[in-house]
Amino acid sequence: MSAPRSSPSPVIAITGAEAACCLGEDLEAIMSRVKAAESGLAMLGDFGLPKKRGGWIADRKRMLHQRYGPASALAVDVAKRAVNARGWSREDLAEAAVFAGSSRGNAAGWLDAWPGRKRRKIYAASNNLHSEIAAAVSIELGIRGATHLLSNGCASGLDALGMAMLHLRCGLAKRAVVVSVDLPLSPALLGSFAESGLLSANDLNDPYSPKTSGFFPAEAGVALLLETSPKRPAEAWCELAGYWTTSDAYDPIGAEPKGEGITRCLTSAVKAFPKRRIAAICPHGNGTPAQAAAETTALKAVFGGEPEKPSLHLLKPLSGHSLGASGALETAILAHSMREGLLPPNFLNLTEPAKGFMVPALAQKLRQDDVVLNLSVAMGGHNAVIALTR
């Protein structure tokens, strides 16, 4: 799938965002720690893994609701805060669409009991629906347009953004609320990741290091607001300018060693902007050795021959890996930074994937016509890229 914007296609702008994760309870708090390159990871003793690190949302009340599962409750929380900050009216919301992305949905609330939640039996069936996340946002915000839930593993958040962009570009709505939530810190889910050998075994928080051994699981909830207009609105944080996906057709869990699917996805994105600089990439960088190898090979294949390579901005060393919510969280962070004409700094002393690829420890300035790519990769060999422009 290839979907760059070309005239006279309308502008699809990100005009607001909210989030909660281990870095903070709102996007401003999160950005404060991102700008300081401060990680929010800590030992998971309270979650049954005292020798592993991960990230959790401190305010557990955000995930408590009698009608909805914990992921749905968090989606409603971040969506309401984003919409209130933007000032959408009741009429605006009624005509909007909802696109949700989640890898595990409300699994954390029905595979294991959610601490502190007093659920109602009548909602037992709806609480184990992934689509309850989108439905809850629609119900609680009065959104009467399309509602969709995308569940493509760790690429779910970017897919929700991309599909929302296409929906608006086709003229089916003027506004969309994109939410992405994952809560992987339940005993059942953590056990499955550990059994599959995906969690970090040596506590090394450096995704491209030869010694990297796995990811750090983390919770997150994110809402992004999209609006369409003939010209870019003054309130825009940045423009959502393209969306591409490919599949590896290789293995249910392992990354294709040569990174061929990632290469095709990135190549499609680059070709969509022949006269503009690809200034930066937020790579998937989840910390598993297989993903590091595939991603490195793809980056070298696409950009290795370029005299000026895009800088890399790895955000999972700060936020942990929130599965399907990770791409949306990274997009919110990038959009907030781009509004200020900057790219976020990296965690200190990260390894470069290959010679010439800069992983800057300080925030970088953006030019007006720069393009920023965000990459997500999911189990099953699903790859997604979005393009953001100022």
Language-model-derived ranges and their functions:
Residues A3-S9, L41-A73, D77, R104-M163, ...:
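Conserved catalytic cysteine-centered active-site region
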Residues L172-E195, S200-N205, T212, Y243-P257, ...:
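Acyl-CoA/ACP chain-elongation machinery
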Residues M1-I14, R90-L93, A236, P274-R277, ...:
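Flexible, low-complexity linker/loop segments at domain and module junctions
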Residues K118-R120, G162, L166, P184-A234, ...:
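Glycine-/small-residue-rich "gating" segment that lines the acyl/pantetheine channel
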Residues L74-R86, I133, G221, K258-F273, ...:
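Short, well-ordered amphipathic alpha-helical segments that serve as non-catalytic structural scaffolds
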